[in-house]
Amino acid sequence: MSVMAAMGGAQVLSSTGAFADPAPDAVAQQWAIFRAKYLRPSGRVVDTGNGGESHSEGQGYGMLFAASAGDLASFQSMWMWARTNLQHTNDKLFSWRFLKGHQPPVPDKNNATDGDLLIALALGRAGKRFQRPDYIQDAMAIYGDVLNLMTMKAGPYVVLMPGAVGFTKKDSVILNLSYYVMPSLLQAFDLTADPRWRQVMEDGIRLVSAGRFGQWRLPPDWLAVNRATGALSIASGWPPRFSYDAIRVPLYFYWAHMLAPNVLADFTRFWNNFGANALPGWVDLTTGARSPYNAPPGYLAVAECTGLDSAGELPTLDHAPDYYSAALTLLVYIARAEETIK
């Protein structure tokens, strides 16, 4: 699917108000469960699967969910918490992690670009939904710094770096394709009309198409791009898996109507080889080995919207084992609601 086709879809959604009011009752109901389980009164979203830490990703997800459900009070509390505790003073990006009880609570000032893009996506949508132009200006400021600070050339690609520090090697750059939050990149182009966003999206589509490995032709959690030639390989230093991070790739590209038919076909083949009752939590892209445990409900929700034949109703957040599985599930609820509206 071309970027221009996806952009046209995004502009239709924006102009018809679907971005401004995408929440049927199901989304609002699931948000209420997420809010009760993972949002603290301070506005801090808690990652229960990682020792109760918080991060820019979680704040972005929470803000996006609240905007989708029309919950302005919760949105404001999460945005204020993120600005106060995570946003940099020298740019508009966000430190990636907050550790309650530690001194300092933000020991690492490095950003996580997906968190930045999720917060900007939430701000842009909240600005439209709640008629708050200041939120849209905040989103545009974040997008400007992501574009200027987090993109670079690697071979034939303009790539989106995962963070400011730690991902540039002598001969390669390390990417996380799940950090390409495609609905946010579409919104960035829609708000700014900067053609550089089009290049980032087009190259993101190319990277997802070319950067797939193993018998199932799946993207790895971490991908290396040769800085001179653009050759792609599974990054060393991480398990060579399709797992915790890469599970978001089909979701984000489906949501933005950018999931190419051949890529969708490979995901569909993978999901249905195992089925809903035996889908692995990870698969090794070099050996084909699978996790000894099955995928949590959030992974099944992603599979359900990208080709799993045996799926039934979407899981509810009542049964989510932790924050991340719940977040994936609620993202699917929102993506499906917007598909229905479109």
Swiss-Prot record:
PROSITE patterns hit by this protein: GLYCOSYL_HYDROL_F8
Coiled coil stretches, renumbered: none
SUPFAM superfamilies: Six-hairpin glycosidases
Active site feature: E57, D114
GO molecular function, one term: cellulase activity
Predominant location category: secreted
GO CC annotation, single: extracellular region
Top EC category: hydrolase
Signal peptide: 1-20
Record key words, sorted: Carbohydrate metabolism, Cellulose degradation, Glycosidase, Hydrolase, Polysaccharide degradation, Secreted, Signal
Location in the cell: Secreted
Disulphide bridges: none
One BP annotation, GO: cellulose catabolic process
Cited InterPro entries: 6-hairpin_glycosidase_sf (IPR008928), 6hp_glycosidase-like_sf (IPR012341), Glyco_hydro_8 (IPR002037), Glyco_hydro_8_CS (IPR019834)
Enzyme Commission numbers on file: 3.2.1.4
The keyword Signal belongs to this UniProt entry's keyword annotation: yes
Reactions listed under catalytic activity: Endohydrolysis of (1->4)-beta-D-glucosidic linkages in cellulose, lichenin and cereal beta-D-glucans
Function: Enzyme capable of hydrolyzing carboxy-methyl-cellulose (CMC).
Family: Belongs to the glycosyl hydrolase 8 (cellulase D) family.
Protein known as: Probable endoglucanase
Organism in which the protein naturally occurs: Novacetimonas hansenii (Komagataeibacter hansenii)
Name of the encoding gene: cmcAX
